[in-house]
Amino acid sequence: DNDGDLDLFFANGHLNSVSGDNRQSNLLFKNDGTGLYTDVSKSSGILDTGQRIHRSAMFADYDNDGRIDLFVTVNGQQVEDGKGNTIYDENQGKGILFQNQTETKNNWVKIRLEGTKSNRDAYGASVSVLVNGIKQKQFLVSGQGYFSNHAQELYFGLGTSIVIDNIEVKWPNGLRQSFEGVQPNQTLLFVEGKANYHKIK
């Protein structure tokens, strides 16, 4: 919802076992900004896909509308008879794409990094965003789930703030770069060592 408070999503599914149903429902919890989380799995539509063997969740703004979407990988449901025979339910292994349709007027910024002296993907870098005295910090890492990875960009919800006071990039080699007075609601590319960033959207 771009309010600056990170919510929690759980991709659930039991490990394959000799007997029993391994399918489970995903869960989504909304952060109210005070450290309390409310279960919004039903109202958000997360439960509409039913119970499956979910394995990992990948976050990205798939449709570039400024709202983070969610793709969940799914294993086929496995049933064993104890004699070495295994049956998989059909159409249970397809991934699920959840499009974020939250009605919000909150602002956001997406940040992409390109290393020059550091690795080109800038893995290991961190980005801090300061808005109205509140700092958010994220790290760009590789391999964040079971055979999956989030989009190679960092996404920050900014609430109703109309300007970003400061963006600081710390590159893997220790170089720090700071940028002030950045406008929200755009995708920005920061290249290591360059004094200016590039607007992508």
Predicted features along the sequence, with ranges:
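Residue-level marker for isolated small/hydroxyl-bearing positions within beta-strands
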Residues: F9-G13, F71-T73
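Beta-propeller blade signature
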Residues: S25-D32, G95-Q99
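Blade-edge beta-strand/turn elements of extracellular beta-propeller
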Residues: G35-L47
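Gly/Ser/Thr/Pro-enriched helix-cap/hinge segments flanking short amphipathic alpha-helices
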Residues: S44, R67-K201
